[in-house]
Every structure is written in C-alpha cells, then in structure tokens.
Amino acid sequence: MSEYLLATHGLTKQFGHHKAVDHVDLHVKKGSIYGFIGRNGAGKTTFLKMISGLSQPTSGEIEMLGYKNAQLKNVRSRISCLIESPGLYGNMSAYDNLAVKCRLFGINDKRYIENILKTVGLSN
C-alpha cells in the first residue's frame, strides 16, 4: 500500500474546450491536512468533486486508500469534503436533504439517516 492517503496523477477535467482542472499531480501523506485556495473558477470544487467520486475525470488517475479510479466506490463512505456553499435545498427538511446526499452514495437506509440526525440533535 502506498505511503499516501491520496495521490492524483495527471488529473484533468474538461468541459468542452475548457480545462477546469489541467494535469494535477498531488500526493497527500496520511495525517496531513490540505486546503484549496484560489479565485472563482480555478477548479477547486471540480477537483474536490473528482476525488470524492461525485464527478469523473476526463483523464488521469486517482488513488485513495489503495483504490484506483473505478474502485473508488469502495471508499466513498470514508471520505468527505467541505465546500463553501452549503449545498442544501431550502425547501426540504433536514431529513430529506440528508436522504438526497445519502442516495448519491448508495445509502437508502432510513434508520441510518435517523441516527445521523439524532446524533446532531435534529431528530423529529
């Protein structure tokens, strides 16, 4: 297993002719904390979406916890990223917002969602 928690090699995301992320190589050692700072449109959110499995790269490789590219679904439940916009739907309850996010990761267990809400004091 690699000494790195996360490694990207030539990671690229292209929308039409625009490269939002262009051949990024990154190696994050276990126990490290990183932040991404840059102007609007620099590709920060696009990069985070790719490494968290919410978007597929146009090219390049992602390795996390020993899993690569298509195998990353095996670690999705163990990773998270905090993006400055909250990504919540104002017209939905806390339960419904959480259920939407859980479905993105293949989690459809009502008890799981209820336990999370109870943990943070939002049950009922």
Give the predicted meaning of each segment.
Residues 39-43:
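Walker A (P-loop) phosphate-binding loop of ABC-type ATPase nucleotide-binding domains
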Residues 34-36, 48:
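Short hydrophobic beta-strand immediately N-terminal to the Walker A/P-loop
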Residues 52:
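Helix-to-loop junction immediately C-terminal to a conserved catalytic motif
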Residues 60-75:
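Conserved ABC transporter NBD signature motif
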Residues 99, 103, 110-124:
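Conserved ABC ATPase "signature" region
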Residues 18-19, 73:
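Short coil-to-beta microelement around the adenine-binding A-loop and adjacent beta1/P-loop entry
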